[in-house]
């Protein structure tokens, strides 16, 4: 079953937002070749290793690396998380100032210490059983460890939480991540005792996979590439690459579909197309409400871009604008319509202007019902 048009459009909008924000943060000054003598001095030792031929290529490499770092930060801090929420109908949720039983806290400390010392191997089923038993004991309550689930969603019979990580997490942070996950599961087990509780750690792609197979993954290989990861985590509590994205959506091949959406938008002419569709360029505003209100050639170009970028509801909005531009509107509705068509699809801070679309469609439906 394919992703719904609504989900696809939301992914497209999020992709456009990220691309536009990256264009906004890279000035002509940022892409100039800069003087970096110390970086260059060290980098020359690696020319053969990374396939750089000369200093000119090296300076371009350093400049691109700085920009790429910013893109990686944007993807890790917002894009992956927002796409996960779109696919799962979930949200980010923080838990603090809560209480757990002392017996639970002691059990978590025991599990963590045993994993650290190597006295036990990670086993998610055994750990869950021990946590359930600890929550059922008669024990005083103590403060729990604050935690945030990057993705949280809840069904009738289960609670699912996911910690989204970069594919190269910092060495030494695995112990803390495991501890946080155990606290999160224990708290949910006590507050929602009749529901199954899952807390995964998720990675958006597998960097150890062959680039010719971007959606593929080898969980064992990936886990072994991270310092102390297998020491604390059972592979059953890890979601990676296609496995993660399809789990979130409930549909197969979701990662490929996400990449297809990105690839349809992220092209060299992105900025040119964005600037064209961000307003309604096909309207001849000095000829509104006449047969010459629409520039048909520009309208076709506008619609082609919306179709290519999978902005399905904006296609309906554009059709409504075309119809309304030819109608005899009341003076009050004219004022509303004229203000709406001078709004942008994306604001200066790159926020999608859904209100513009909704108000235009509302006005259109009002006249179509007459």
Curated annotation (Swiss-Prot):
InterPro entries: Restrct_endonuc_II_TdeIII. It catalyses: Endonucleolytic cleavage of DNA to give specific double-stranded fragments with terminal 5'-phosphates. Pfam families: RE_TdeIII. It is an enzyme of class 3 (hydrolase). Keywords: DNA-binding, Endonuclease, Hydrolase, Nuclease, Restriction system. Its EC number is 3.1.21.4. GO terms for biological process: DNA restriction-modification system. GO terms for molecular function: DNA binding; type II site-specific deoxyribonuclease activity. Belongs to the TdeIII type II restriction endonuclease family. A P subtype restriction enzyme that recognizes the double-stranded sequence 5'-GGNCC-3'; the cleavage site is unknown. This is Type II restriction enzyme MjaII. It comes from Methanocaldococcus jannaschii (strain ATCC 43067 / DSM 2661 / JAL-1 / JCM 10045 / NBRC 100440).
